[in-house]
């Protein structure tokens, strides 16, 4: 079994790619990771690849949809990390899903960690440290007695429907600051 990371994608090449070219390069990287996984599990189906994930998640292996979803904003802002870490991370999930009892295994359990370490030669990190400000905008300003808060469109919509949020420090209900 191969225990080295996938070959690095040249940084300068990644930095110069347009969005469409970047997505195509990411699909190629998924193909390389899939070929690596097939060394140990030849029956592994090739995953579909979509760039429709939003919010703070960088990637998602989606068994029901039959493939991998990636956050296009985080991909654009963290190109090297995506190619070196995120794509192998999600492909490790894809492989574990397809093993016997894969759907019953913990997402970041022993099997996933083994794939990350022994197949991709990477530390089994569960979370990323990307700046998610552009990927997860919070344009709605709220205020309590002690500070301001930025709420996401989803939380703001819940407030409009009647949900209330309280400050964890002063316990006052947050109030929308229009404008």
Which residue ranges define each predicted feature?
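Active-site recognition of the HExxH zinc-binding catalytic motif
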Residues: 85-98
């Amino acid at each position: 079994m191969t225990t080295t990371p996938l070959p690095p994608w040249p940084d300068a090449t990644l930095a110069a790619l347009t969005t469409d070219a970047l997505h195509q390069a990411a699909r190629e990287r998924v193909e390389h990771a899939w070929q690596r996984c097939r060394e140990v599990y030849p029956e592994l189906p090739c995953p579909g690849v979509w760039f429709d994930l939003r919010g703070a998640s960088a990637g998602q292996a989606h068994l029901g949809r039959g493939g991998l979803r990636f956050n296009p904003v985080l991909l654009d802002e963290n190109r090297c990390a995506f190619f070196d870490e995120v794509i192998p991370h999600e492909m490790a999930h894809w492989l574990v899903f397809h093993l016997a009892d894969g759907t019953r295994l913990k997402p970041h359990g022993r099997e996933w960690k083994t794939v990350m370490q022994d197949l991709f030669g990477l530390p089994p990190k569960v979370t990323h440290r990307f700046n998610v400000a552009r990927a997860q905008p919070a344009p709605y300003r709220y205020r309590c007695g002690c500070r301001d808060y930025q709420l996401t469109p989803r939380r703001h919509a819940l407030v409009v429907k009647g949900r209330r949020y309280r400050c964890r420090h002063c316990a006052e209900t947050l109030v929308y600051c229009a404008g």
